[in-house]
């Protein structure tokens, strides 16, 4: 409660201080009963289905269709699709809880299940009712895949460097170009595609690109070989080439020329989910490390009794809990329709770094066994690295964070956003 002096100095009435006190009592970090049930159901599926199958799919690299179908039947796939389009209609926070739980079992299998999320976001942001009913409705009805096609061989972090172009002819657009590292590309029923619609290289990004929904069976689309990646190996990643691909004008997402804003806006919705994936991996690292430390003996006692190991476990726990807080906050920002670029970037950046440090510590705690594929932490370390790369590298997140805080400080005299 504010003191009488503080109340007077700030110009707050007694009624206002009462409201402030009431609001402070309403702040809670507890999940609702429904959210706890969602989390428990996802974690049960993760431990019973994903954990036992993780190593097999990591070795084979096969896409986990049967597991994807099971997840869809349980409502764990694309849970953020609104009920009006046939989906579960879960919040961004509830979706993050599912991603975290599934990633505890295997981030590669999780990506197979939740990979369409990034393609869903721009449709949700900029799609008209007909587009949402058709494309979101299809994802809700069946366990199918959709892909986000923006990255190119020469345009990763620099989205303004996209070379894929589109040309309007009558009631159609003709798309030509090549996209790289497309998650789910080998199985996608439709693609979100960003193409340059203004041939002037000096045109501002906000007016130079147009976004499309492109059906996967459109003539002129070719799918490259499945990439052999360091981690998350069952995730299907490919190059997608568009050669004179004709797309009806009705498949433009948002206004012509406004594609860059649509593509970037999707990240505010999806980065909390990516952060949640990193959380799940870090959580698994901590559990595996604690279990091993209580069993493995060295110098006549369990290694958990050695301070060097205790400190690594403590560091993992500290960062995991902090990453979880900012991830949940960034997800809640989306649900509350608060502009979330700042917190979403912090969550994605910190959770990604947390996952990588947790994996490094886990391997260290396991010692020589941690370097061997017979133990789970070797795979966790390989899977962790991509979180510092995809959906915006950790360096790009830091650029976003610094620009926003400096701009806010210049305008408001404080870095607190």
Swiss-Prot record:
Homotetramer. GO terms for molecular function: flavin adenine dinucleotide binding; medium-chain fatty acyl-CoA dehydrogenase activity. Keywords: FAD, Fatty acid metabolism, Flavoprotein, Lipid metabolism, Mitochondrion, Oxidoreductase, Transit peptide. Its EC number is 1.3.8.7. Its cofactor is FAD. Pathway: Lipid metabolism; mitochondrial fatty acid beta-oxidation. It catalyses: a medium-chain 2,3-saturated fatty acyl-CoA + oxidized [electron-transfer flavoprotein] + H(+) = a medium-chain (2E)-enoyl-CoA + reduced [electron-transfer flavoprotein]. It comes from the Eukaryota. Pfam families: Acyl-CoA_dh_1 (PF00441), Acyl-CoA_dh_M (PF02770), Acyl-CoA_dh_N (PF02771). Belongs to the acyl-CoA dehydrogenase family. This is Probable medium-chain specific acyl-CoA dehydrogenase 1, mitochondrial. GO terms for cellular component: cytoplasm; mitochondrial matrix; mitochondrion. The lineage of its organism: Eukaryota, Metazoa, Ecdysozoa, Nematoda, Chromadorea. The gene is acdh-10. Substrate binds at residues 157, 268-271, 392, 403. It is found in: Mitochondrion matrix. Coiled coil: none annotated. FAD binds at residues 148-157, 181-183, 296-298, 306-307, 364-368, 393-395. The active site is at residue 391. The keyword Lipid metabolism applies. Its main location: mitochondrion. The keyword Transit peptide applies. It is an enzyme of class 1 (oxidoreductase). Residues 1-13 form a transit peptide.
